[in-house]
């Protein structure tokens, strides 16, 4: 048995989807706190880097000059004159488009043997819970991410929302849970997709 001084990261490699990874996983903190560059650096060194999908339309606007949030602001202003903002729903196809653009660029910059995953929080809904979550999940798969970490919610239906996507069985999928009860609920609901 090796002494502590003789241990190296290579002694603890993880095999995941045919790749041998070092045991470094960087979390996906939202609104570009965990930047693409940070996740790419971790992946380049053989670990798993995460980005978050929180506020991806705004992030795409700031990084790529798109107009997702401007479009929303104009629509809200027009609606406010008549009924108020409460009735406005951001078009889910734009959410999927923004996710695919941002996450696709992150994946284009990946080098090395590591992986890039996206942290998707169930609780970010934009007034249309299931439709918004589905668009975010499918946008991530469209972009070619290596994996999705499901967090901030039970995600009982998330596998079903993605199950028709061509990459559903290719991407690594994981869930962050806070209790055995939450895990059991997730497992029971997700088992129907045949992906567990």
Give the ranges of each region predicted by the language model.
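Active-site entrance/lid segments in N-terminal catalytic domains of soluble metabolic enzymes
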Residues: 1-196
